[in-house]
């Protein structure tokens, strides 16, 4: 998402539905380090920027990064990269490949001014644990006014070089209609695979139009988290509680923006996730927090067109606020993936920020350890 800155297996499904995560203390998170890429770094004829999603291939250790460039600067694309993540931080980031994301007809995607129905808004990318293909999400286009073509959100599967394979059937309430579905630029971003690749979980970044207003400084809001099989069958859908805005927004042309840009499934505990919530408030800049999320006991809302007043949302525990770490500035952090385990046994997390292709913002890689 672009934000204006002011400076398979039925047995697996059954386990998910019936088993609650084992009660335990929330994990602790510590800061390992960070590094930044040069602004407007050029690679193979493209400008490296707008990195809104990241994943690590556990089979090779290679990373994949998706740009949210809507073909304004270069055709919609993703990159592969090598880097070293250890107990002292992130080192030696090296882009190794650039690949255009391909339309089903084999061509590249158009930019929105073309108004030809071939635009996309790439946000997240994941390595398929089963096939090694890339699955990527995009928000589509809900026009501000009547007339321009509506492009629906989607989760697509691509080969390792970006060729279209197919698309995951999505819940009906993920679709844009006149008065239903996701808000503009607050649609489908976060996606995650279960460890075995049998399940795909997605989160709508902000509340659906029919589910109420966006968060304010006084109250939060409810968006939706959906668990599906990899062929598209909906297993469950839950309300996800977004935090209130962390500050009162100053008046101006740009309103506040808050939501869930990334989520990871816990590889050991079915039904447990780690979610990023990123908020931008005019006059207060960014706040980025990491939450542990458990869906056990939450109401299944897949058949609720409008969320009921007595809905029981998923449970959250805040694990970290990036303001508590020695970062020079809090950026538009949108990407989240597992890194390698440390010798201490801690799991690592790699976060990446979207610089919006702006000179005053940064492409930053942040390493955390989770115990």
Predicted regions: what is each one?
Residues 9-19:
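Bacterial N-terminal signal peptides
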Residues 2-6, 24-371:
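Sequence/structural signature of beta-propeller domains
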């Amino acid at each position: 998402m672009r934000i204006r800155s002011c400076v398979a297996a039925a047995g697996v499904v059954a386990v998910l539905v019936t088993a609650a995560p084992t009660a335990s203390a929330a994990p602790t998170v510590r800061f390992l380090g960070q590094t930044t890429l040069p602004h407007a770094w050029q690679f193979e004829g493209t400008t490296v920027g707008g990195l809104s999603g990241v994943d690590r291939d556990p089979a090779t250790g290679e990373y994949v990064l998706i740009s949210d460039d809507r073909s304004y600067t270069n055709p919609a694309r993703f990159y592969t990269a090598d880097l070293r993540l250890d107990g002292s931080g992130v080192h030696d980031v090296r882009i190794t490949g650039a690949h255009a994301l391909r339309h089903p007809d084999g061509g590249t995607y158009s930019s929105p001014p073309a108004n030809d129905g071939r635009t996309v808004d790439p946000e997240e990318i994941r390595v398929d644990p089963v096939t090694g293909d890339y699955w990527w999400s995009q928000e589509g286009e809900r026009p501000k006014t009547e007339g321009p073509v509506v492009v629906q959100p989607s989760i697509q599967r691509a080969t390792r070089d970006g060729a279209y394979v197919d698309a995951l059937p999505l819940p009906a309430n993920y679709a844009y209609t006149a008065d239903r579905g996701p808000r503009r630029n607050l649609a489908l971003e976060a996606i995650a695979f279960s460890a075995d690749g049998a399940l795909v979980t997605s989160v709508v970044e902000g509340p659906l139009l029919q589910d109420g207003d966006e968060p304010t400084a006084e109250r939060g809001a409810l968006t939706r988290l959906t668990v599906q099989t990899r062929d598209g069958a909906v297993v469950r859908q839950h309300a996800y509680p977004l935090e209130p805005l962390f500050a009162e927004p100053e008046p101006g042309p740009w309103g506040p923006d808050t939501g869930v840009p990334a989520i990871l499934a816990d590889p050991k505990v079915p039904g447990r996730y780690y979610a990023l919530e990123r908020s931008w408030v005019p006059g207060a800049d960014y706040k980025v927090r990491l939450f542990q999320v458990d869906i056990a006991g939450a109401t299944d809302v897949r058949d609720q067109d409008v969320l009921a007043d007595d809905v029981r949302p998923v449970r959250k525990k805040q694990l970290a606020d990036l303001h508590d770490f020695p970062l020079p500035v809090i950026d538009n952090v949108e990407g989240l993936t597992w890194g390698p385990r440390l010798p201490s046994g801690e799991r690592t997390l790699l976060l990446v920020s979207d610089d919006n292709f702006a000179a005053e913002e940064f492409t930053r890689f942040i390493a955390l350890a989770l115990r």
